[in-house]
């Protein structure tokens, strides 16, 4: 049953119905639509539109419908309804007859769907918050296990300075915490109830919208009916937050894919999150990480899609806004599975310490230490930088590490170099000197892990 029709004399085209109907997408709002309808029944009862008995009958029927659909979700799509609101109303009328036709009094699908969608965002958002917390915990646990595993740090994908794997893990903890902050902030802004805003001008019935908002666990009602029915900022913000978080997950995936290559060999991935080749028997591919990286693009696409849909819409509601859900649902599904998969990858990850240490000892990652040593002897840093650059060229030519030079050879670069240079060029010294807040010294990494565990 359509929720409109009296204005029309001709039949709706079958093609238009297929084009216009949103049930194949918005069926996911069923529970929110029923919950909102139960609250609305109380609201219209409070202003005398229905009696207390009628309200009780409506709520009983709606709760029965909720149980029935949870037992057999397929009945929604099998109904052929235009949208989830039409399905719920038709099913309600089938249960209670003409009483069901009273429920929509004072309500529009415009404020109804806006409320449903915010309720859905709140519910799914809470689950995403929990997933972010789980991933954060896995990163901290991995950082604690491997806090002192030495590996090369990179800039421009060139070996730069030694760091620890624990320090690397903590970098992504920082990113995940920012994702958590963005998501919780977005959910706070979405915690307002549009119900009672009508089609665009507000409902004609003097109900208590504050009570209605609280009944649906919103912090407060929205304050402008035009904005209430046309606002999709919560969709944009959730897609934006997901996009930033997926960017972080993709960067982490890229790092781990590289660390897992035969050329690097810093880590091994569990069989749980890898797959093989149909042709090459030796292959163990990091498919979980590659899919995280790949799904990031589709999340970005949905963000651009909703921004583009909304950018030129006049107030208030327009049918364009029906396109707000498919992308959002896909974003939330993609983000959720990627968060789960990232946590699973980390839980089974093993650091190959000898390989990672060997790589850190190569590539002249201690060159900065030699420059700092020269500075400690009184040489200006810019001059020291040049001297060490010359020394690196010479070391490359001789195929030796910097610490492979004899003292006499060192003195050809700068005669202020003494025997005490050698202790400064060890990996241990490189790490220990970064003993500053946020640094990679083992003392700092341990303190950071302790702080994260406490928080």
UniProtKB/Swiss-Prot annotation:
GO molecular function: argininosuccinate lyase activity
Enzyme class name: lyase
Cellular localization per UniProt: Cytoplasm
An annotated GO BP: arginine biosynthetic process via ornithine
SUPFAM superfamilies documented for this protein: L-aspartase-like
Pathway(s) where this gene product acts: Amino-acid biosynthesis; L-arginine biosynthesis; L-arginine from L-ornithine and carbamoyl phosphate: step 3/3
PANTHER family: ARGININOSUCCINATE LYASE
Family: Belongs to the lyase 1 family. Argininosuccinate lyase subfamily.
Name of this protein: Argininosuccinate lyase
Native organism: Shewanella oneidensis (strain ATCC 700550 / JCM 31522 / CIP 106686 / LMG 19005 / NCIMB 14063 / MR-1)
Lineage: Bacteria, Pseudomonadati, Pseudomonadota, Gammaproteobacteria, Alteromonadales
């Amino acid at each position: 049953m359509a929720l409109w029709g009296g204005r029309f004399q001709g039949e709706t085209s079958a093609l238009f119905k297929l084009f216009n109907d949103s049930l194949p997408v918005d069926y996911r709002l069923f529970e929110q639509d029923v919950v909102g309808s139960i609250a609305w029944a109380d609201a219209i009862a409070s202003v005398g539109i229905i009696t207390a008995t009628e309200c009780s009958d409506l709520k009983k029927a709606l709760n029965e419908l909720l149980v029935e659909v949870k037992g057999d979700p397929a009945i929604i799509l099998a109904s052929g309804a235009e949208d989830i609101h039409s399905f719920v109303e038709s099913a309600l009328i089938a249960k209670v007859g003409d009483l069901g036709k009273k429920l929509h009094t004072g309500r529009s699908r415009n404020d109804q769907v806006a409320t449903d969608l915010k309720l859905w965002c709140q519910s799914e958002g809470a689950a995403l918050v929990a997933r972010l917390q789980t991933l954060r915990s896995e990163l901290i646990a991995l950082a604690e296990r491997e806090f002192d595993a030495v590996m090369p740090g990179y800039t421009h994908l060139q070996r730069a300075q030694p760091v620890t794997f624990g320090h690397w893990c903590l970098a992504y903890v920082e990113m995940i915490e920012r994702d958590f902050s963005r998501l919780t902030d977005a959910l706070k802004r979405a915690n307002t109830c549009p119900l009672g805003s009508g089609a665009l001008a507000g409902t004609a019935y003097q109900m208590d919208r504050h009570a209605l908002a609280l009944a649906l666990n919103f912090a407060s009602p929205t304050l402008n009916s035009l904005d209430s029915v046309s606002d999709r900022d919560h969709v944009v913000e959730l897609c934006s937050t997901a996009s930033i978080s997926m960017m972080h997950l993709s960067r982490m995936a890229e790092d781990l894919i590289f660390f897992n290559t035969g050329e690097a060999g810093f880590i091994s991935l569990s069989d749980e999150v890898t797959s093989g080749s149909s042709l090459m028997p030796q292959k163990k591919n990091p498919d979980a990480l590659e899919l995280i990286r790949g799904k990031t693009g589709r999340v970005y696409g949905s963000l651009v899609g909703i921004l583009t849909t909304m950018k030129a819409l006049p107030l208030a509601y327009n049918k364009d806004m029906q396109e707000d859900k498919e992308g959002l649902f896909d974003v939330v599904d993609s983000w959720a599975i990627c968060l789960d998969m990232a946590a699973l990858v980390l839980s089974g990850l093993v650091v190959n310490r000898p390989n990672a240490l060997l790589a850190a000892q190569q590539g002249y990652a201690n060159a900065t230490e030699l420059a700092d040593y020269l500075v400690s002897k009184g040489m200006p840093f810019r001059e020291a930088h040049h001297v060490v650059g010359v020394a690196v060229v010479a070391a490359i030519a001789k195929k030796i590490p910097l610490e492979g030079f004899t003292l006499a050879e060192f003195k050809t670069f700068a005669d202020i170099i003494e025997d005490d240079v050698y202790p400064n060029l060890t990996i241990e010294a490189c790490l220990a000197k970064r003993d500053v807040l946020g640094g990679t010294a083992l003392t700092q990494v341990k303190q950071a892990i302790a702080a994260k565990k406490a928080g």
